[in-house]
Structures are given as C-alpha cells and as structure tokens.
Amino acid sequence: MNTWKEAIGQEKQQPYFQHILQQVQQARQSGRTIYPPQEEVFSAFRLTEFDQVRVVILGQDPYHGVNQAHGLAFSVKPGIAPPPSLVNIYKELSTDIMGFQTPSHGYLVGWAKQGVLLLNTVLTVEQGLAHSHANFGWETFTDRVIHVLNEQRDHLVFLLWGSHAQKKGQFIDRTKHCVLTSPHPSPLSAHRGFFGCRHFSKTNQYLRHHNLTEINWQLPMTI
C-alpha cells in the first residue's frame, strides 16, 4: 500500500464523506468565505504521500483568519506572519535543535515534503469562526486516516499536542509507533510543558534508532 488512494480512496465513496463535501460546497455557494480554498483542502495528502509519511503532527481546525490556511496544520501561506502557536513551535525548535534559525515566515511545506504529515482533524472552517465546521463529519475521515497509518505503517512518530490531539490518537499502537505528547503550543498552554518537550530532537532520535532518515527541521529563512 503506497498511495493515499489505495489507503483511504474508498472513504470518498462513503455517504458521510459525500455529505461533508456537500455541506462545504453549500457554505461556499451561500457566499460565506471558507478556508482553505477548495483546491487546498487536501494539500496535506498531496504533499506527503502515504508511503512517505514518517511523522504526523495533528492540528485541530484550519486557521480562520484572512488567507492564512492552505491545508497544512500550523502552516500559513507565504507573506502571512506566523501565528502565535507557530511562533512557539519555532521557539521550542530553537532551544531543541542546535543551530535552528527562526524563519521570517510560517510556510511549512519544507517539512511536508520530507514526510511530515501536517494533519488538521477538521479540514475546513468559516472565516472568523473557529470550530464552525467541527460537526461536518471531518473527524470521521481523519480518524480513518490515523487508523490506516497506525495499521499499515511501522515506526511512525506521532506528535500529539494538547488534549484534542491526544484523545484523537489514543488508539495508536505504542508498541510499533512512537507517540510523543505535550500541552498545545498555544500561548495559553505552551508554558505548561510544550516548552522543553524536545519533541523535534526526540523524533529524530527515534527515526535514527530505526535506521530511518531524520527530518531536517530547518526551513528556508525567507520564501
């Protein structure tokens, strides 16, 4: 099983999935602004193929500010200032990874292309309304994504930040995957244990131990 199409393609035929797409389409057609744009809703899967996944970082729902979201958890489009949670992720990286330099942008495509699946548990949101699509059915789909990664792949690293992600990943088999948990990097909770969690170096330690290529967490300084 190498591709997302092989792994979860059948989900797209399921009535619940068709219902999600209908609800999102209706919201767009009613004139509401929905993020990310239609062509970027599934960017995480396009940029990180199923057999290339080495690390999974779970987010919640997309950023709901103007032109921030582009389909990757925690990432923003070029030209958009890194949001507070991402600023804190960079802070932790700068203390955890020797030589890490904080980029001026928040565009995390460089991680996605190395096998870091940046997966939000809900894939769409209405502008200015956090969690507005939380009941659309996306959670069923992303549960299935995590389930198939858990079953069909070995030696993945799951980074679960905050109670929502931890609850979502509670069924992951800890005997064949590495599961790292901490509080969410949001300014509300980062000081409770996200700072100092060293998840990025621990990820590479685990990958190295299993003779897998480490992640180069350094991003280009500018985009």
UniProtKB/Swiss-Prot annotation:
InterPro entries: UDG_fam1, Ura-DNA_Glyclase_AS, Uracil-DNA_glycosylase-like, Uracil-DNA_glycosylase-like_sf. The keyword DNA repair applies. SMART domains: UDG, UreE_C. Its EC number is 3.2.2.27. It is found in: Cytoplasm. The active site is at D61 (proton acceptor). Keywords: Cytoplasm, DNA damage, DNA repair, Hydrolase. One of its GO terms (cellular component) is cytoplasm. It comes from the Bacteria. It catalyses: Hydrolyzes single-stranded DNA or mismatched double-stranded DNA and polynucleotides, releasing free uracil. Its main location: cytoplasm. Excises uracil residues from the DNA which can arise as a result of misincorporation of dUMP residues by DNA polymerase or due to deamination of cytosine. PANTHER family: URACIL-DNA GLYCOSYLASE (PTHR11264:SF0). This is Uracil-DNA glycosylase. It comes from Histophilus somni (strain 2336). The lineage of its organism: Bacteria, Pseudomonadati, Pseudomonadota, Gammaproteobacteria, Pasteurellales.
